[in-house]
C-alpha cells in the first residue's frame, strides 16, 4: 500500500471516529436540554412546585460542574473511549429511569445519572480530536465540535417538544434513552484508537493533585477565565434549559411552535458568532476582557428591554433577546483562552476544568433562585403570571453584577502580573487611537501625511502582529 493510500485510510478512520464522537456529544446536549421543554408536563406528572422542577436541572448541572476536574484526571488515566462509552450508557439508563418514574425522588436520581454521563462526553471528544488530527486542524475541529453540539438543542426544541405534546411522558423519554443506547453502540464500534492510559496521573499522590488545582486557581488569569465563563453563558443556559419555554408559553402566551422556534435562534447565532469571536480574540488578545464585558452588557440590555416592556413583550423582542444572550455562548470560550494563556501545559487541563465550572455554577444558582421566586408568586393552582416570571428573571442582574465586578478585579490583578513581567497594557483609548491610525495609514498609503506612530516597545504599530491584551 502506498503512503498516499495509508494517509487516505488514516484520514477516513479519523473521520469515522470523530463522527461517532460528535454523535455522542450531540446526544449529550440533547439529554442536557430535553428537560427544558418538559417543565410543565413534569410539574403535572410529579405534582411538583416550580422550585422542585428547577431542582431537576440544578441537580444535573451540579453533578456536571462537580465532575469537570475529576473527568480531566480520568481522561489521562483511562483514555477517552472508555469514558464516552460509560457516559452514553449512564445517560441511557438515566433517561429510561426518568421515563418510568412517577415520583419526585426517583426522577431526581435519574437526572443525577444523566448529568454524570453528560459530564464525561465533551472533554473526551476534544481529547480525541487532539489525537486524531494534525495540530493545524485541531483548532478548527474544536470549534466545529462546539457548533455541531447545538444540533442536540435543536432536537430538544423541535422534534422532542412535538413528540412530548403528541405522545406520553414514558414514550417520549424512552426515545431519548434509545438515542443514548445508539450512541453507546456507535462509540463501541467506531470511537477507537489513540487511548493512552496515562502513567503520569498514577504517579500523582492526592496531595499533588490538590496542589495542582490550588496552583491553577492562584493565578489571577485562571480566575479571570472562571469569572468570564461565569458571566457570559448563564442567561442563555437558564433560558434554553429550563425557564425560557414556560416563560414564553405561560407568561407570554406564545404557541408551542413559536416558543420552540425561539429556542432554535440560539443555534443559528452560535454558528455565526463563534467564528467572529474567534477572529476577534486571535486579532486582539490583550482586549479579550472587553469582548467579555460587551457580551454581558448586551445580554443585560436585552433583558432590560423585555422586562421593562409594558405587559407581554412582542415576539420580535424575544427574538432580539435570543440573539443577544446567545452571543454569550461563544463569548464564554474566551475563558478557556485565558486558561491556556496563563497556565503551563502541565496544569492546563486543571485550569480548563476550573474555568468550565464557572458557567454551570452561575446557571444552576440562577435556575434554583428563579424557582424559589416563582413559588413566592404562585397563584395557588400551579400557574405563574407574567409578572412572576419577570421578577424571577430580574435575579440575573445580581449574577451579572457579581461577575462583572470579579472580572474587573481579576483583570487588574492579571495586568499587574503582566507588568511585573515587562508587558504594559495601554489604555483602551490609546489602543483605539492606534487602530484608527493604522486604518488611515492603509487608506492613504505610506507617502501621504506623517509617518505612523511608533509604539513604546519600538515596534511599528502597523505591524500585523496583534499587540492588544486582556
Q: What is the meaning of each model-derived region?
A:
Residues 144-195:
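Helix-loop-helix hairpin linking two adjacent transmembrane segments in secondary transporters
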Residues 2-10, 194-226, 424-442:
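Juxtamembrane intracellular "pre-TM" segments in multi-pass secondary transporters
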Residues 66-105:
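Conserved MFS/SLC helix-loop-helix module at the cytosolic interface between two early adjacent transmembrane helices
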Residues 77-87, 282-297:
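Cytoplasmic membrane-interface "Motif A"-like loop-to-helix N-cap segments
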Residues 47, 79, 100-106, 134, ...:
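Helix-breaking motifs and short loop linkers at transmembrane-helix boundaries and internal kinks
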Residues 110-149:
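Cytoplasmic helix-loop-helix junction between adjacent transmembrane helices
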Residues 35-36, 220-275, 366-371:
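Extracytoplasmic gate region of multi-pass secondary transporters
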Residues 67-79, 273-287:
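Helix-to-loop junctions at the C-terminal end of transmembrane segments
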